[in-house]
Amino acid sequence: MNFNWDVFWQYLLQPSGVYLTGLWLTCVISVLAMAMGCALGLAAALLRLSRNPLLQLPVRFYVWLMRGTPLLVQIVFLYTALAAGGIFRFEDVQLFGLVVPGNIQAAIIALGLNEGAYMAEIIRAGIGAVDKGQYEAGRCLGMTFAKLMRRIVLPQAFRVIVPPLGNEFNVMLKNTTLVSVIGVQELLLSTQMVTSATFRVFELYLVVALYFLLLTTLWGLFQRCLEKRFGQSDRPAPPAAGSRMFGRHTFKLLRGR
């Protein structure tokens, strides 16, 4: 089968409503699942800091389970196995006037639970990178643990967390393709539906690959801006022109200091 450039350019530059719906749903699922993952990761990371084993052990088990099993298995298990076992079934719900299908709910929760395990380790590493003297200073000021984290530790840890956080969202965008197995009409399943009607497989899969490349590129640019924004306070001040030319001590002598 020859590659049809007309079909390729048509769906790339003038995407159908099915494509636009899948693209929108991919972005919505990614953002909501990432927000859930960050919230779970923060809670899990703070519990890991506790010296109480009753708080640490459940979190350790959660991180071990989510990171040690395939994401595809987690998605299928959450949506189908729980329903088949009579434990829980995702039903359609109405939220703010919109009907949210059960498979979309399961997709967001499954992706969020998986992401929370990875974010827990990222946030824990970011908190561990903060100098221990900051903790002692906060305790000397009489700060509670919550206030110490909110005012001193987490703002500094966020500078360390931003780069891997951006990478995790990049992965999340591509992981949304896995939820097509439970019937969520994201970008990949939308492409499969159009492919079954047009029989132009290579052209349409190349289009969806370029769409994902566009999404990850735009996010990469935004991530770079975030890293620059939160890394400004860690950068040393640029030296003066005379200091660069003559050296720091020579410049002081020229000014009579």
Language-model-derived ranges and their functions:
Residues 1-257:
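Transmembrane alpha-helices and adjacent helix-loop boundaries
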